[in-house]
Structure formats: structure tokens, C-alpha cells
From Swiss-Prot:
One Pfam family per UniProt: MraZ
GO CC terms in record: cytoplasm; nucleoid
Annotated InterPro entries: MraZ, MraZ_C, MraZ_dom, MraZ_N, MraZ_sf, SpoVT-AbrB_dom, SpoVT-AbrB_sf
Assembly and oligomerization: Forms oligomers.
Matching SUPFAM superfamilies: AbrB/MazE/MraZ-like
GO biological process per UniProt: negative regulation of DNA-templated transcription initiation
Similarity comment text for this entry: Belongs to the MraZ family.
NCBIfam families reported in the protein's UniProt record: division/cell wall cluster transcriptional repressor MraZ
Protein name, per record: Transcriptional regulator MraZ
Organism from which the protein derives: Methylobacillus flagellatus (strain ATCC 51484 / DSM 6875 / VKM B-1610 / KT)
Lineage: Bacteria, Pseudomonadati, Pseudomonadota, Betaproteobacteria, Nitrosomonadales
Amino acid sequence: MFRGATSLNMDAKGRLAVPAKHRDALHAQSEGNLVLTAHPHRCLLLYPLPAWEPIQSKIMALSSFDRQSSALQRLLVGFAEDVELDGAGRLLVSPVLREFAGFEKQVMLVGQGSHFELWSMEAWRAQLQQVMSAESVELPDELEGFSL
């Protein structure tokens, strides 16, 4: 289970060092074989390969004749790249995905349970500000009776 938010520095080659606490779990789940892809919110998704494969199968089972489905297929599967953690626990983000997400030097790694989101620092702060300034957040019906 991946949780927590960590600020990472991207090097000049586009590599990010994954924190040790997550690195060990990623190696245990997938031997360091990961999938990195684009998300409609202009962040990236990082999945252990075994967790990504059933998601990709579901996405590709959608009708390619439906505009929304085919757009989602192009985004999530079309941008998907196999990446590996190197010996130093780093992953390489391709120039295409760096450009898509607007990555510069600082990147936020945000645990989402089964996977991570990677955000440019600017986009991370903007979406946090948007969430925090919302006067009323509408909850999905499934969460109406939920309390923290």
C-alpha cells in the first residue's frame, strides 16, 4: 500500500530517486518493473506492472468506436511506458511524459494505495489550492455516510 506525499528532485537526465520505503515495496511487488503513463489531470501514474496489467485489459476492452473510450485508450495506454528501477532506485521519466506533465526540477510523488501519482510542483500546488478553497465539495453517493 503506497501512501504519503514526498517532494523529489529530478536530475538533468529525467531520473527520479524513489524513496527507500517505497522502493522495497515496488521490488517485492514487481521486481522493479513499473508502468508510467499519463493521466487526464496532467499528472503521471506509476504502477507496479502486475497492478497495471488488469487495468490496461479493462481499458482496451472498451469500445474503440466510443469517442470517450478511445480518447481514454489513447491517453492511458498510448502514453504508457515500461520503466525499471535502476540499481540506485531511480526511474527514468521520458521526455514525452516530462513534457506532458510539465515536469521541471521538483516533482511530487503521491501514494494512492495501489499506485502513485507524479505531479509537477506547480500543478500539485494549484490542485491543492483548488481543493482547499472549494466552499462545498460534493461527495459521490457512495461516500455520503462515510466519516473520518
